[in-house]
Regions:
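Bacterial N-terminal signal peptides that target proteins for export
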Residues: 2-19
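N-terminal signal peptide c-region/cleavage motif recognized by signal peptidases
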Residues: 28-30
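N-terminal small/polar-rich segments of proteins
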Residues: 32-96, 129-171
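Predominantly extracellular/luminal cell-surface or secreted proteins
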Residues: 79-81, 102-106, 114-116
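Substrate-binding/active-site groove segments that recognize
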Residues: 99
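Extracellular beta-sheet repeat scaffolds used for adhesion and glycan interaction
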Residues: 108-137
């Protein structure tokens, strides 16, 4: 007599994408029944004048494709690593100098976007519906707010984050 095969439960997916202050990357990781990608364009601050703070933004887009018939609601959480430096002071290097900056969860620039575990950091959560039907997809976007603090006496030149900041998505 044959035993029925146990049906696997759908695990929570986990995906990692890398983002540097001067470069954006796309990465994907399939879950059992669905696949999601994270797209992160470059966060380019522009010209820094050493007297005033400088802000910039970029948008993280989460896109999931459904492989089954019923409609699905995707809930996700985005966490960022500290990259080089720490959550208190992320760093870009160039021309022999270091320029400190940070990434925030809102335009108010009060809560550092991090892992949600390390003191004072928070993650960003979102959700969206994907209609039923194989190959149907949906997406949601979150804004990353960046700020370079004022009064950093650095030489002119191009600055970038040599070690990428990692974005982890749990869904």
């Amino acid at each position: 007599m044959k035993r029925p095969r146990p049906q696997p439960s759908r695990p929570r997916g986990r995906m990692v994408a890398a983002m540097a202050a001067s470069a954006g990357l796309v990465a994907a990781s399939p879950a059992l029944a669905d696949s999601c990608t994270v797209s992160v364009p470059t966060l380019a601050f522009g010209a820094y004048d050493t007297i005033n703070a400088l802000t910039g933004t970029t948008t993280v887009t989460v896109t999931c494709t459904h492989t089954a018939n019923p409609a699905t609601r995707f809930n996700y959480v985005l966490a960022l690593s500290s990259g080089p430096g720490s959550y208190a002071s992320r760093q870009m290097t160039g021309t022999g100098d270091t320029l400190t900056y940070n990434l925030y969860t809102t335009a108010a620039l009060t809560t550092v976007w991090g892992d949600g575990i390390t003191g004072g950091t928070a993650t960003v959560a979102g959700s969206f519906n994907v209609p039923g039907g194989a190959g149907r997809s949906g997406n949601d976007s979150q804004t990353i707010y960046g700020r370079i603090g004022a009064a950093q006496n650095v030489l002119p030149g191009a600055y970038s984050t040599a070690t990428p900041i990692t974005i982890t998505i749990s869904y």
